[in-house]
């Protein structure tokens, strides 16, 4: 995948979650709840502060993160793969 996010943006691939109903039926597609966990595929150089310095991001490529899929999240298809482009502020935690 040849993409480089700018500034404090992060490219995340959503991790698939297998959802099971109360009766034990495996739900897929639109019936399944979308995961808010993903793997970081690429990161920008960092946030530019008011004094002009760049603050590096806390996440790195390969981290599994929990994210908030809010207003600023952009869905894109790159090399046939759906990815999310979001700001570091939309990341809530690093798993593991």
From Swiss-Prot:
InterPro entries found in the cross-reference section: Chaperonin_GroES, Chaperonin_GroES_sf, Chaprnonin_Cpn10_CS, GroES-like_sf
Subunit organization: Heptamer of 7 subunits arranged in a ring. Interacts with the chaperonin GroEL.
Family stated for the protein in its record: Belongs to the GroES chaperonin family.
Protein name (database record): Co-chaperonin GroES
Keywords assigned by UniProt, alphabetized: Chaperone, Cytoplasm
PROSITE patterns the record matches: CHAPERONINS_CPN10
HAMAP family, alphabetized: CH10
Lineage top rank: taxon: Bacteria
Subcellular location: Cytoplasm
SMART domains: Cpn10
A GO term, aspect molecular function: unfolded protein binding
GO BP, one annotated term: chaperone cofactor-dependent protein refolding
Species this protein is from: Shewanella oneidensis (strain ATCC 700550 / JCM 31522 / CIP 106686 / LMG 19005 / NCIMB 14063 / MR-1)
Cited function: Together with the chaperonin GroEL, plays an essential role in assisting protein folding. The GroEL-GroES system forms a nano-cage that allows encapsulation of the non-native substrate proteins and provides a physical environment optimized to promote and accelerate protein folding. GroES binds to the apical surface of the GroEL ring, thereby capping the opening of the GroEL channel.
GO CC, alphabetical: cytoplasm
């Amino acid at each position: 995948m040849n993409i480089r996010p700018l500034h404090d943006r992060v490219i995340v691939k959503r991790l698939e979650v297998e959802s099971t109903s109360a009766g034990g039926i495996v739900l897929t597609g639109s019936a399944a709840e979308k995961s808010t966990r993903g793997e970081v595929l690429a990161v920008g150089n960092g946030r530019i502060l008011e004094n002009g310095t760049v603050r590096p991001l806390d996440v790195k490529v390969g981290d599994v993160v929990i994210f908030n899929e809010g207003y600023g999240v952009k869905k894109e298809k790159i090399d046939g793969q759906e990815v999310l482009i979001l700001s570091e502020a939309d990341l809530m935690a690093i798993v593991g």
